[in-house]
Amino acid sequence: MTQPLGKNDGGYFGETIRISDVLERTLAAAEQHGWSVELFPGAGELPLYGMRRLAKRERLSVYISTGIHGDEPGGPVALAEMLEANAWPSDVSLYLCPCLNPTGFPGNTRENLAGIDLNRDYRHFKSPEVTAHKAWIDGLPEFDIAICLHEDWEAKGFYLYELNPEKQFAASEAMLEAVGAVCPIDQSELIDGRPAKGGLLRPIASPDARPLWPEAFYIVQNNKTRLSYTLEAPSDFPMPTRVDALCTAVKSLIELHLATR
């Protein structure tokens, strides 16, 4: 199994990307494979894109986003590779956001160019990026599951957060088993200060008690979906390992949910 590189110390010091090149790949693949692509309402000069591909006979609807932290390059690369591979099941409607923080990547910063952590802005909407993203999300129909692609520079392996307030069927454990074949799973009992088991965290605190909301909170609290997976690849590992882990996780979640339909 692949080992960590040992480069991260106090932050992410691994391989970086030119986000404009990754988005160019993503947009080219979307055009080639018949996706509808639009700029977020009010995005201005920011390259904030929403993509959709609707199934003619829908069995499952899925929302996927990434690139909200500029020091987490694996997610945008993974989504670009999935669009290029075009291996999505034909009976799944998909709504994608390929990069939510385009100004963070040039400086390899978690925050945007103005110093705002966008993934803590989904309650008060102070940033233009999140305000524009909210406008796009609010115009979407409800979807069955949401998948947010992230990375963690401190993680010992792959892990995820599951938001599932109604305790409906979730595929977290089976997905982790699939990912474990390509990337180590973080087996820590505490991850980011929260209880975890086998790489799975299920937050129990009410979002109403949190003054700052991540993207997943907004989506679930506003009933766009009642099941959200936030995937965290370990960014101290080589880029191909992290990308493979995220792609495997997304593919597994979609297949596992389709199997229950």
Question: What are these model-predicted stretches?
Answer:
Residues M1-R261:
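Structured catalytic-domain cores with a bias toward divalent-metal coordination
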